[in-house]
Structures are given as structure tokens and as C-alpha cells.
Regions:
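Non-heme di-metal
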Residues: 2-120
Length: 120
């Protein structure tokens, strides 16, 4: 559901650029519905934890902790590994993109950690 939401918002942006405002509106309204579905899934998953990190979720404090864990994984493991693979396969431009994203994810982790620290 989350993936569909992001895809449809991307498709809506493309439709806007191409002048298909009515099509863009269909994509956006459907994306909003997909968001509702994803939120419903997450409400059920509060009992078992964040599917992305395994961390408890539900309260703002727990949600921030899960966000820090997720973003930290992305900047320390996921994107660096993807960048290495891309570079090894000769996709230097994509590797550079992944390295840029790793820096952004590090910033996100820091923002979430700061918010968590300010809660306590």
C-alpha cells in the first residue's frame, strides 16, 4: 500500500507535467486511499512491532526510536551496500545517487534522534 501510494503520487506529478490534470487527480485521490490502507495495516502491526525494524511502535517515543533505527540502517548498511553493488556493476551514477541518499538518511536519523531527546 505504501509503495502504491508513492508510485501514484509520482505518476500524478508526471501527468501534471504532461498536462493531464484530471488523470493526476485520479492518481492523487487513489494514493490517499492507499495511505488509509497502509495506516490500517500499521495499526494492526502495533501489536507486533515495526515491520521494517522490528522495534515497538505506537507511541510517539517508540515511533521515533523505530525511525532512528530504520534511518540508521539505511545510511550505515542499505545505501552503502547498494552503492558498492552499483559501482561494482559499472553503474557509477547510480552509486553516487545511493551515496547521496545515505547522507540524507543520516540527517533524517539525526532529526529523529533530536526529537526523541527533546521528548525526555
Amino acid at each position: 500500500e505504501s509503495l502504491a501510494n508513492r508510485r501514484y503520487l509520482y505518476f500524478a506529478q508526471k501527468a501534471d507535467v504532461e498536462g493531464y490534470n484530471d488523470v493526476a487527480a485520479v492518481f492523487r485521490s487513489t494514493a490517499e486511499g492507499e495511505t488509509g490502507h497502509a495506516h490500517g495495516h500499521l495499526e494492526y502491526l502495533e501489536e507486533t512491532g515495526d515491520p521494517a525494524t522490528g522495534e515497538p511502535i505506537g507511541s510517539t517515543s517508540n515511533n521515533l526510536k523505530a525511525a532512528v533505527v530504520g534511518e540508521t540502517h539505511e545510511y550505515t548498511d542499505m545505501y552503502p551496500g547498494m552503492a558498492r553493488s552499483a559501482r561494482d556493476e559499472g553503474f557509477d551514477e547510480i552509486a553516487t545517487w545511493f551515496e547521496t541518499l545515505a547522507k540524507a538518511e543520516r540527517s533524517h536519523a539525526g532529526r529523529f534522534q533530536k526529537a526523541l531527546d527533546e521528548l525526555d
